[in-house]
């Protein structure tokens, strides 16, 4: 039972693709592929995250372009594996989020991918648009990965937390009782990456070394933490619409050292994680990290300092490398769609009930 999962997250760095096998008693991650976005595509996608002229046309063109990139990722996986395309049951493609607005009335979430075109380019069944059904059922449409976390990482005797540090940070609680819950804590890498790009020209702060060279500006940090989202109770989700440099700018005096702001933004990510853990899961002692932020040594060190007595590891220790968890999740969500099985967790998203997610484009 071969499936492909494709994820391109809010960090806008590129495409993660995986080839997985669900046929055995346990999940198998067979092959992986990463394709970085070029500067022009990344800039175009960033431009669509804000209101502008001719948005519908630009979104349609970019959706087609992205589908070509996604097809390229699928092709590379097949080359690596030697598996015949006809053996792939489905491709689960999240698409590239450009708007996430799950308000109670007229809520929506838009991910760029042309599912019909991707099905034509690959000759495979494609599943996309995973978030809309949950929002239609009164949910946030996010986070969706906790259902996969429960399937893969739950332990019958140990309460675990899975913390995904992507553009946005989300946390999944996997209690022994099985009552899974989770939510978006706040910005993960998103603000750090944007500040780093603006002031160094680099797309991210490797290992958090630039942040480490600065100092935390505590008044700025406390000002940022006073933002209402952080005190909202779950279920809740967020995105680039809420957290961007436009959000940060009014909080700056203008004379701060750029490395100090970077250090403060890293500490914001750390604090929103630790505050979430201490508020909702104070007794949990096992934390597992995934997503790009899991490789930020400065962030992980500060997280360990803020959460003494907890064991913090990568999800690699549970059998899935930290970089590929989300892409694997969308392969699993595609399987749930094909098998007409639920893909959301109402306790996480706030939906009125379990739903089969995704729109299917047959091969």
Curated annotation (Swiss-Prot):
EC number: 2.7.1.170
Residue numbers binding ATP: 9-16
Pfam family, one: AnmK
Pathway(s): Amino-sugar metabolism; 1,6-anhydro-N-acetylmuramate degradation; Cell wall biogenesis; peptidoglycan recycling
Example of a GO MF term: phosphotransferase activity, alcohol group as acceptor
Keywords per UniProt: ATP-binding, Carbohydrate metabolism, Kinase, Nucleotide-binding, Transferase
GO terms for biological process, alphabetical: 1,6-anhydro-N-acetyl-beta-muramic acid catabolic process; amino sugar metabolic process; peptidoglycan turnover
Transmembrane stretches, start-end: none
Catalytically driven reaction(s): 1,6-anhydro-N-acetyl-beta-muramate + ATP + H2O = N-acetyl-D-muramate 6-phosphate + ADP + H(+)
InterPro entries: Anhydro_N_Ac-Mur_kinase (IPR005338), ATPase_NBD (IPR043129)
Enzyme class: transferase
Family: Belongs to the anhydro-N-acetylmuramic acid kinase family.
Role of this protein: Catalyzes the specific phosphorylation of 1,6-anhydro-N-acetylmuramic acid (anhMurNAc) with the simultaneous cleavage of the 1,6-anhydro ring, generating MurNAc-6-P. Is required for the utilization of anhMurNAc either imported from the medium or derived from its own cell wall murein, and thus plays a role in cell wall recycling.
This protein's name: Anhydro-N-acetylmuramic acid kinase
């Amino acid at each position: 039972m071969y499936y492909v999962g494709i994820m391109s997250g809010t960090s806008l760095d590129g495409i993660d693709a995986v080839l997985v096998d669900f046929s055995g008693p346990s999940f198998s991650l067979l092959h992986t592929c990463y394709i970085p976005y070029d500067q022009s595509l990344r800039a175009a996608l960033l431009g669509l995250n804000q209101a502008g002229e001719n948005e519908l046309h630009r979104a349609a063109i970019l959706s087609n372009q992205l589908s070509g990139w996604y097809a390229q990722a699928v092709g590379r996986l097949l080359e690596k594996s030697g598996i015949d395309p006809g053996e792939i049951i489905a491709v689960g493609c999240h698409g590239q989020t450009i708007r996430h607005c799950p308000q109670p009335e007229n809520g929506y979430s838009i991910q760029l991918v042309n599912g019909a075109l991707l099905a034509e380019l690959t000759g495979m069944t494609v599943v996309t648009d995973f978030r809309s059904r949950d929002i239609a059922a009164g949910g946030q449409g996010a986070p969706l990965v906790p259902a996969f976390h429960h399937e893969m990482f739950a332990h019958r005797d140990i309460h675990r937390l899975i913390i995904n540090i992507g553009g946005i940070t989300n946390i999944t609680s996997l209690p022994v009782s099985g009552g899974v819950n989770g939510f978006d804590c706040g910005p993960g890498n998103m603000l750090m990456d944007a500040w780093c790009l603006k002031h160094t020209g680099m797309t991210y702060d490797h290992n958090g070394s630039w942040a480490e060279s600065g100092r935390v500006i505590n008044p700025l940090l406390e000002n940022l933490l006073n933002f209402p989202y952080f005190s909202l109770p779950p279920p809740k989700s967020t995105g680039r619409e809420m957290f961007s440099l436009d959000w940060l700018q009014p909080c700056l005096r203008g004379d701060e050292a750029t490395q100090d702001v970077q250090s403060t933004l890293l500490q914001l990510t750390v604090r929103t994680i630790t505050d979430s853990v201490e508020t909702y899961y104070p007794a949990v002692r096992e934390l597992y990290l995934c997503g790009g932020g899991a490789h930020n040594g400065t962030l992980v060190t500060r997280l360990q300092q803020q959460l003494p007595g907890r064991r913090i590891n990568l999800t690699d220790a549970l059998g899935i490398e930290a970089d590929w968890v989300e892409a694997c999740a969308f392969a699993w969500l595609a399987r749930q769609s094909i098998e007409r099985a639920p893909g959301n967790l109402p306790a996480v998203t706030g939906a009125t009930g379990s739903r089969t997610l995704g729109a299917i484009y047959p091969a």
